[in-house]
C-alpha cells in the first residue's frame, strides 16, 4: 500500500471535515461526545479482546512492566475513558468565546474570540486511552484529528477509534473528523510530520526518543509534550511525615506516568533522620533507591547513583536520592536536570516556598503536594491532550483552550485609515 498517498487522502478528508466542524453547534458536538462514551461502554468487550491480544504480544516481546501498565486496559479504565468524554461534553465550549474587546477612538469595535486550530495530528506510544481523550478534546474544540498510536497498541487503538468515529458520524459529526493511522511502519510518522498545509499542528506524546524525533524533523508546527524528570525537595523545616506520604504517592502510586517523581532531594540538616524513614517507606512499595555518596553514607543499602540517573525518566519503581546543602543547591540541581514538567517543595518556610516557586523553571511548581496532580482532570480542564513542557502556544496540562487559536472581529461604520 502507498503510505504517502493514503496519508495525504486522510489529511485531505480531515481538512474538509475541519471546516464543517469549526461552525458546528455546541449541542451537536456534545451529543456526539456522549454517543462516543456510550459506544465505548456498550462495546467494551470488543476493546478488551483487542487489548488482550496486544498485551500477549507485548509480553512475548519482553517489554518491561511499566510499559505493560501503560498498554493495559480493563473495564475500569474503559469506564474512565467514557467518563472523560462525558466530562468533556459538560465543559464550556471555548469556540467563539470572547476574551478581549475594545472600542477605539475612531469608533472601531474590536473583539478577540477563540477559534479551532483546524487539523491536529497526535503521535503517541503505548497508551490506548489517549485515543479517546484526544479524539474527544479535539472534537469539542472544533478540530479534526488524525491519530497515530504505537505499534504495540495497534489492535486496541483500531477498536477504540473505529467505535468513536462511527458513533460521532451517526451523531452528526462530519466524516473524516476522527481518523486513525493503522500503519505500524515508521514511514507513516515521517509522512505525517510533513503534511504542512493539511495539519495545523502535531502533538507527540511518549518517550524522549519519539518527542526528539518529531521536534527535530517535523515540517508541521509542534507542541512538545515533554518527558517528566520530576523532583521533590524536602526542605529543612518540612513536616517529615507529610514528606514521606507525598514522596510515596509521587513515586509509587503510578510510576509509569510522566508526573511521577524521579528524584528526591533532601536538605543536609535533616537527611540523617529523614532518609531511613524514606528508605523503609519506599522499600515497602518495592521502590529501588539510588543515592549520592552522602545519601549512601546514611543508608548504605541504597544503590549508587550515577550522573546519568539525575537526568533519567525511569518510568519504573526506581528513585534517585541526593542530599543537598540548601535551597540554592536544590534549585540549581532541578533547573539543570529537569524537563520543565512538575517540581515540588515540602516545607513550612513560606519564604523558601515562594522562592522555590519563583526560581524553578517548570510548567507546574508545587508547595506541600504531590507532583502527581499535574493532570487535566485534576486541574479542572477535563481530559488533557498532553502536558506541554514548552513555553510557546501552551504550557502545562493542555485542555480545550490549548486546542484553539484566536481571531479578531472588527466592526466599523465606514472608517478608513488616514
Stretches found by the model and what they are:
Residues 1-110:
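N-terminal Rossmann-like NAD(P)+-binding subdomain of aldehyde/semialdehyde dehydrogenases
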Residues 17-23, 264-266, 316-325, 340-345:
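Short, well-ordered beta-strand elements within core beta-sheets of diverse protein domains
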Residues 26-27, 95, 171-177, 255-260, ...:
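Flexible, glycine/charged-enriched surface loops at secondary-structure junctions
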Residues 31, 327, 332-417:
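C-terminal core of ALDH-fold dehydrogenases
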Residues 90, 99-237:
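Rossmann-like NAD(P) dinucleotide-binding subdomain of oxidoreductase/dehydrogenase enzymes
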Residues 126-129, 133-141, 159, 163, ...:
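ALDH superfamily catalytic-core signature
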Amino acid at each position: 500500500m502507498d503510505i504517502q498517498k493514503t496519508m495525504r487522502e486522510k489529511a485531505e478528508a480531515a481538512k474538509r471535515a475541519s471546516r464543517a466542524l469549526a461552525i458546528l453547534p455546541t449541542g451537536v458536538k456534545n451529543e456526539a461526545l456522549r454517543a462516543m462514551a456510550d459506544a465505548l461502554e456498550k462495546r467494551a468487550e470488543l476493546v478488551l479482546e483487542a487489548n488482550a491480544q496486544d498485551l500477549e504480544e507485548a509480553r512475548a516481546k519482553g517489554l518491561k512492566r511499566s510499559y505493560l501498565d501503560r498498554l493495559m486496559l480493563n473495564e475500569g479504565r474503559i469506564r474512565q475513558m467514557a467518563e472523560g468524554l462525558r466530562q468533556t461534553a459538560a465543559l464550556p465550549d471555548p469556540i467563539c468565546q470572547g476574551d478581549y474587546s475594545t472600542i477605539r477612538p475612531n469608533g472601531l469595535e474590536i473583539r478577540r474570540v477563540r477559534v479551532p486550530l483546524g487539523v491536529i495530528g497526535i503521535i503517541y506510544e503505548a497508551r490506548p486511552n489517549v485515543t479517546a481523550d484526544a479524539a474527544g478534546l479535539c472534537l469539542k474544540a472544533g478540530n479534526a484529528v488524525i491519530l497515530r498510536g504505537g505499534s504495540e497498541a495497534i489492535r486496541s487503538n483500531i477498536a477504540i477509534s473505529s467505535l468513536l468515529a462511527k458513533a460521532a458520524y451517526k451523531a452528526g459529526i462530519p466524516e473524516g473528523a476522527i481518523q486513525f493511522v493503522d500503519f505500524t511502519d515508521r514511514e507513516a510518522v515521517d509522512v505525517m510530520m510533513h503534511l504542512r498545509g493539511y495539519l495545523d499542528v502535531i502533538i507527540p506524546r511518549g518517550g524522549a526518543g519519539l518527542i526528539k524525533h518529531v521536534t527535530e524533523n517535523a515540517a508541521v508546527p509542534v507542541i512538545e509534550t515533554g518527558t517528566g524528570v520530576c523532583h521533590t525537595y524536602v526542605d529543612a523545616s518540612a513536616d517529615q511525615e507529610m514528606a514521606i506520604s507525598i514522596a510515596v504517592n509521587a513515586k509509587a502510586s503510578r510510576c509509569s506516568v510522566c508526573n511521577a517523581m524521579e528524584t528526591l532531594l533532601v536538605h543536609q540538616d535533616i537527611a540523617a533522620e529523614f532518609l531511613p524513614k524514606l528508605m523503609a517507606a519506599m522499600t515497602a512499595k518495592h521502590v529501588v533507591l539510588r543515592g549520592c555518596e552522602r545519601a549512601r553514607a546514611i543508608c548504605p543499602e541504597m544503590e549508587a547513583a550515577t550522573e546519568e540517573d539525575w537526568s533519567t525518566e525511569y518510568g519504573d519503581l526506581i528513585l534517585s536520592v541526593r542530599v543537598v546543602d540548601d535551597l540554592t543547591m536544590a534549585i540549581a540541581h532541578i533547573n539543570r536536570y529537569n524537563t520543565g514538567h512538575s517540581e515540588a517543595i515540602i516545607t513550612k518556610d513560606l519564604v523558601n516556598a515562594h522562592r522555590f516557586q519563583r526560581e524553578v523553571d517548570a510548567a507546574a511548581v508545587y508547595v506541600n503536594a504531590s507532583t502527581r496532580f499535574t493532570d487535566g482532570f485534576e486541574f479542572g480542564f477535563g481530559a488533557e491532550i498532553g502536558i506541554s513542557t514548552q513555553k510557546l502556544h501552551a504550557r502545562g496540562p493542555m485542555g480545550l483552550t490549548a486546542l484553539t487559536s484566536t481571531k479578531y472581529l472588527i466592526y466599523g461604520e465606514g472608517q478608513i485609515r488616514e
